[in-house]
A protein has these predicted regions:
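Short strand-turn segments of transmembrane beta-barrel domains in outer membranes
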Residues: 1, 18-49, 62-75
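Surface-exposed loop/interface segments of Gram-negative outer-membrane beta-barrel transport/assembly proteins
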Residues: 1-28, 73-81, 85, 91-205, ...
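A generic structural signal for short, solvent-exposed coil/turn residues
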Residues: 42, 53, 101-103, 214, ...
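Predominantly transmembrane beta-strands of Gram-negative outer membrane beta-barrel pores used
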Residues: 45-76, 85-91, 110, 209, ...
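An active-site-proximal structural segment forming one wall of the substrate-binding cleft
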Residues: 220
Length: 337
């Protein structure tokens, strides 16, 4: 009702006829923001750690698990985040004879290990009109989330001859989603948008650092360290047939997958000498470092999914000769010394 009254007032001020004859008959209308927002989106965070020390060993082990549902799309599994982390930090004193001799008198070994696994989904961000949130902010409350009864049949009849039209039904209740008219431009029914499957992002990251420090002589130390970073990440998903608006439709189903991997390792050897004479301190450092970064990626798409319950590339029928199958990939390598 408030929207209809404001639109009528705007029309009168512009010198044109009011659009709504009985604005008080429309009631509350659709609160699109209320429909879109995931109220009380849950956040869960668990942390556990164990630590201890002795004359020979210092150690810390920890694990964490974190999940968060998105405020927009979280209840549609379109905006969610999950992270698992594991960490281990240990230091070993293999021997310490510094009180008995001044050569080869101590050796310490350190290891730091960590692992992180992340799974996430996300919706389009930073879009004024095309995103679910942008549409929820600007759509008319006179529109309904669903077309039911005669309105549903009217939609099917209206778009029957539109070549890329595929109706979208809510998987939760089987109702037909409404389609905003052309006067709303790029805006779409945000609930229909959120009901579509989004890309599922994933990553695995392993980080390991090892070092050993040997006391060679008084004031003379040798330290060697090795670090490795292994990362694997990508996304998988599919696009079904759908029609949200003119210019916002998919006339063919597509399965896609993208995978990346990267490895970075670094080796350092350092010889250190420190000497203090009266009020003067001298330091000499001799070092060597080597680093290598390698990686690769592989991406593929294939159209014509046979069954949405198995939306995978190997369960689709598209052929490369018809332009319905693509693949790409490449390695990479950078090394320094």
């Amino acid at each position: 009702t408030e929207y209809a009254l404001m639109m009528n007032e705007g029309a009168i001020n512009a010198g044109i006829a009011p659009k709504y004859n009985d604005p008080y008959s429309y009631g509350m209308g659709t609160d699109w923001q209320n429909e879109v927002f995931n109220d009380n989106a849950p956040v869960m965070n668990h942390q556990v750690s164990v630590s201890g020390a002795s004359d020979k060993v210092n150690y810390l082990f920890s694990a964490g698990y974190y999940t968060q549902d998105g405020i927009v799309g979280g209840n549609f599994n379109r905006s969610n985040y999950e992270r698992l982390t594991l960490r281990s930090n240990t230091q070993y004193t293999l021997f310490d004879e510094s009180k008995n001799r001044n050569w080869l008198n101590s050796l310490k070994v350190t290891s730091n290990l960590s692992y992180a696994r992340i799974k996430s989904t996300g919706i389009e961000a930073n879009s004024t009109w095309g995103s679910p949130l942008g549409s929820a902010l600007a759509l008319s409350p006179m529109l309904t989330v669903y077309d039911e009864g005669d309105a549903a049949q009217a939609q099917l009849d209206k778009y029957a001859n539109t070549t890329d039209y595929t109706p979208i039904f809510d998987p939760r209740n089987g109702k037909l989603f409404s389609i905003p008219g052309s006067e709303f431009g790029e805006m779409t029914n945000p609930i229909a948008n959120l009901s579509l499957p989004g890309a599922k992002n994933w990553s695995h990251k392993f980080v390991a650092n090892f070092s050993a420090e040997l006391q060679l002589w008084d004031n003379l130390k040798f330290k060697t360290s090795y670090g490795a970073d292994l990362s694997f990440w990508g996304n998988d998903g599919y696009t079904p047939l759908y029609y949200l608006r003119s210019g916002g439709a998919s006339s063919r189903s597509t399965a896609y997958s993208e995978k990346h991997d990267g490895t970075v390792w670094q080796l350092e050897n350092v010889l250190m000498y420190d000497k203090t004479i009266d009020k003067h301190t001298f330091s000499v450092l001799l070092g060597q470092s080597a680093k290598k970064n390698t990686g690769s990626y592989l991406r593929g798409t294939r159209n014509n999914i046979i069954n949405y319950s198995r939306p995978y590339i190997n369960a689709s029928t598209g052929q490369a000769a018809d332009g319905d199958q693509t693949a790409a990939g490449a390695p990479s390598e950078i090394a320094t010394l």
